[in-house]
Amino acid sequence: DCPPDWSSYEGHCYRFFKEWMHWDDAEEFCTEQQTGAHLVSFQSKEEADFVRSLTSEMLKGDVVWIGLSDVWNKCRFEWTDGMEFDYDDYYLIAEYECVASKPTNNKWWIIPCTRFKNFVCEFQA
């Protein structure tokens, strides 16, 4: 079961935070919310679609931080929860390190980590 204000999908809990933070501050914020929580990681298109359903109406076309970056390991993107990045729909090459998702169309954007964005946290229930 997920705590109040969190949504459940496939054994994980998700929550959209309409607060503006840099990527690293958002990741730290997520880890403080629940044991094992991180910025959201996507392991399937269906999971990404579920998160999109939580956020798209509130964002009106903006992007949200997700837990994918190459902040710690240049040239190799990794999820903050330790899951391997093997999401077939995306191939990432960019000059920036942090990834945001645009929920209205599930497109991913690689942008500077210092931008202020809303975000989604996730943890295993």
Swiss-Prot record:
Pfam families in UniProt: Lectin_C (PF00059)
Biotechnology: Is a standard reagent for testing vWF/platelet interactions and detection of the defects in von Willebrand disease and in GPIb-related disorders such as Bernard-Soulier syndrome.
GO molecular function: toxin activity
Alphabetized PROSITE patterns for the sequence: C_TYPE_LECTIN_2 (PS50041)
Keywords: Disulfide bond, Hemostasis impairing toxin, Platelet aggregation activating toxin, Secreted, Toxin
Entry's localization field: Secreted
Ranges where the C-type lectin domain occurs: 9-122
Coiled coil: none
Protein's UniProt keywords contain Transport: no
PANTHER family linked: MANNOSE, PHOSPHOLIPASE, LECTIN RECEPTOR RELATED
Quaternary assembly: Heterodimer of subunits alpha and beta; disulfide-linked. Botrocetin and vWF form a soluble complex.
Homology family: Belongs to the snaclec family.
Anything else known: There are two distinct forms of the vWF-dependent platelet coagglutinin. The dimeric form (snaclec) is 34-fold more active than the metalloprotease botrocetin in promoting vWF binding to platelets.
Name of the protein this chain belongs to: Snaclec botrocetin subunit beta
Organism listed in the record: Bothrops jararaca (Jararaca)
Lineage: Eukaryota, Metazoa, Chordata, Craniata, Vertebrata
